[in-house]
Amino acid sequence: MTDTTADQTRHGDRPYDVVIIGSGLSGTMLGSILAKHGFRIMLLDGAHHPRFAVGESTIGQTLVVLRLISDRYGVPEIANLASFQDVLANVSSSHGQKSNFGFMFHRDGEEPDPNETSQFRIPSIVGNAAHFFRQDTDSYMFHAAVRYGCDARQYYRVENIEFDDGGVTVSGADGSTVRARYLVDASGFRSPLARQLGLREEPSRLKHHARSIFTHMVGVDAIDDHVDTPAELRPPVPWNDGTMHHIFERGWMWIIPFNNHPGATNPLCSVGIQLDERRYPARPDLTPEEEFWSHVDRFPAVQRQLKGARSVREWVRTDRMQYSSSRTVGERWCLMSHAAGFIDPLFSRGLSNTCEIINALSWRLMAALREDDFAVERFAYVEELEQGLLDWNDKLVNNSFISFSHYPLWNSVFRIWASASVIGGKRILNALTRTKETGDDSHCQALDDNPYPGLWCPLDFYKEAFDELTELCEAVDAGHTTAEEAARVLEQRVRESDWMLPALGFNDPDTHHINPTADKMIRIAEWATGHHRPEIRELLAASAEEVRAAMRVKP
């Protein structure tokens, strides 16, 4: 008798309520929520913990949604991932800090121009973000899920999935079976459910193209030590205090340090490169490491930053990484997060997207389990959200790769993305605040009531601006206009915008570093109070005292 069969026998052959394939962060957060609310959950995974995983960088919106699902569903361990300080205190000291998104523009053989950099400091109103050392965060949530009552099988290879009117049967390579009322596949690219049901789109509808080479390194210097920047052009916080993006024509490189704070105990740094495979075809004549260094050597500042670095784990080199699925929900199943599709680590949206899907799926799935009604229609919004998250992020990243050959065009992409991220994050934060104040979950459910599921700022005026951005970038890509002309039009739109948070400098293309201090956020709140757009008033208007309290600063 296998362990899995034994688990079900102890419960009188009663099926599990939900079987979750994949015990990474998405599977274990969902499993913890469901088990906390009294449902029987089985986690299946072909690997084990601790283990390496990608998705190490968080964003402000990730922190807010982590807090929201923790409070909404009563799982405090999830909130322990929602700030740098809480991760250090509750998970481990192996994580890095992330105070900012940093972008540095590069050309072959040239030093970077200090006037061609962009930094977006994460607003303290949402907290301090972290660089997740995923083997620790994932193991932490796995053990939390087990404590809440999830059963788990590691090293479990799924061979077959069979649905019938009463539920689902998962068969393992070891001959065991797991019976459940519902299945969630939270695995990844090699999703057993996507494979068996033929859900992968071939070819993918996604526009973005990139392949990847990555590893963990020691000996990575701070880029701050290797660029000569006049004092007046330096960013408000060091580049090394956050995630560094070295951007260049049709590609970018990430530097994600875990050792960038005084209490650091982890010497590692996550390093990788994304390359449009149409511009940079794979080099089978080179090892992954050799190919990586061939690109590092193109850019003098990056070469200096990595001069003393060496890899401490095997290199990974992929083909094109983008994939999508024709459906993500069905009768008694859901294909979740990276099992459904993937775009690119640019903008660090992976974990944020995962949390949004968990938030939308959890209450619907619990209601379906209680009512024994798994009609696909009740999960329709989850499908819309998953597909929307893929499609909007695909456009954003594709626009960015197009703009990476022309800094003024990239400058507009950066502003239109980052300004809306502040507004969209505040929308979620407001729902969390009102829910905590009233105990009324309708404020959280209202987040689902928007016309553009998956768009980080689902408001009409932002969609209009983003659509124009996409149209112009795609026209550049098709050769119908020049990057210079597209940049000129977008710069004018940015300057004339009535919603782009003027106190932060988003509508001034010469303000390269966005630093949301308390004084600036108070000015934004005052500006919003009399704004002609009701959405701006509703989302951003506040008193100076409320802003200071939210940012934890004294008058």
Swiss-Prot record:
Disulfide bonds: none
Pathway annotation from the record: Antibiotic biosynthesis
Keyword Cell division: no
Molecular function GO terms recorded: FAD binding; oxidoreductase activity
Positions annotated to bind FAD: G22, S23, G24, L25, S26, G27
Domain of life: Bacteria
Catalytic activity from the UniProt record: tetracycline + FADH2 + chloride + O2 = 7-chlorotetracycline + FAD + 2 H2O + H(+)
Identification of the protein by name: Tetracycline 7-halogenase
SUPFAM superfamilies recorded: FAD/NAD(P)-binding domain (SSF51905)
